[in-house]
C-alpha cells in the first residue's frame, strides 16, 4: 500500500487534449504505483511515443489514486490518500518500483491546465499483508 498526503489545485485544460481531458475541462492529477519486472531502467521518450504500458505483463502489481480523488477541485488543505496495490502475477518477483505523481494526468501527452499544482508529502510504502492485494477484484 502506498500512502501519503496530497493537495491538488487544478486549472482548466488549456493545452492539448487527450482522453477525457479536452480544452475547457478541469484538469485531473495522477498518482500511481507499479511493481515492474524490467531488465533495465525504463526511459519514457515523448518524441518517439515511448511510454510505460500499464497493461503490459511486465507490470506485476498496480494501484492508483481513485478518479474521484484525482478530480478534486475543492482542496484547501493536505488530505491523506491510500493506494492499494493489486497483484496481477503472484509468481514473478518485481525488479523495479515505479511511482508517478503528476499535476496533469496526461501531462506526458502535453495535455493539461497551465498552473495545475500537486503537492505531495509523507509518501510511505507499507508492507503489511493485505489479502485484498491478492485478488483480481
Describe the role of every protein-language-model region.
Residues 17, 46-48, 98, 111-116:
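Surface-exposed beta-strand edges and their flanking turn/coil or helix-capping segments
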Residues 1-40:
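Extracellular-facing segments of soluble proteins and assemblies that are Gly/Ser/Thr-biased and enriched
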Residues 40-94, 113:
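Extracellular carbohydrate recognition and processing domains
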Residues 75-77, 92-96, 104-128:
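Extracellular carbohydrate recognition
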Residues 128-137:
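Residue-level detector of functionally pivotal "anchor" positions at catalytic/ligand-binding pockets or at interdomain
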Residues 1-7, 32-34, 80-86, 96-100, ...:
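Residues within well-ordered beta-strands of beta-sheet-rich folds
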Residues 13-16, 41-45, 93, 109, ...:
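Short acidic, gly/pro-rich beta-turn/loop elements at beta-sheet edges
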Residues 19-28, 85-95:
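Short, surface-exposed loop and linker segments with low hydrophobicity and enrichment for Pro/Ser/Thr
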Amino acid at each position: 500500500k502506498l500512502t501519503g498526503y496530497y493537495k491538488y489545485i487544478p486549472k482548466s485544460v488549456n493545452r492539448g487534449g487527450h482522453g477525457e481531458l479536452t480544452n475547457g475541462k478541469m484538469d485531473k492529477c495522477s498518482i500511481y504505483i507499479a511493481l515492474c519486472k524490467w531488465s533495465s531502467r525504463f526511459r519514457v521518450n515523448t518524441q518517439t511515443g515511448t511510454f510505460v504500458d500499464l497493461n503490459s505483463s511486465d507490470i506485476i502489481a498496480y494501484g492508483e489514486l481513485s478518479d474521484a480523488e484525482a478530480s478534486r477541485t475543492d482542496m484547501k488543505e493536505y488530505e491523506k490518500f491510500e493506494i492499494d496495490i493489486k497483484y496481477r502475477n503472484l509468481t514473478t518477483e518485481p525488479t523495479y518500483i515505479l511511482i508517478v505523481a503528476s499535476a496533469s494526468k496526461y501531462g506526458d501527452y502535453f495535455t493539461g491546465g497551465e498552473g495545475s499544482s500537486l503537492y505531495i508529502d509523507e509518501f510511505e510504502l507499507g508492507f503489511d499483508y493485505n489479502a485484498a492485494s491478492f485478488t483480481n477484484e
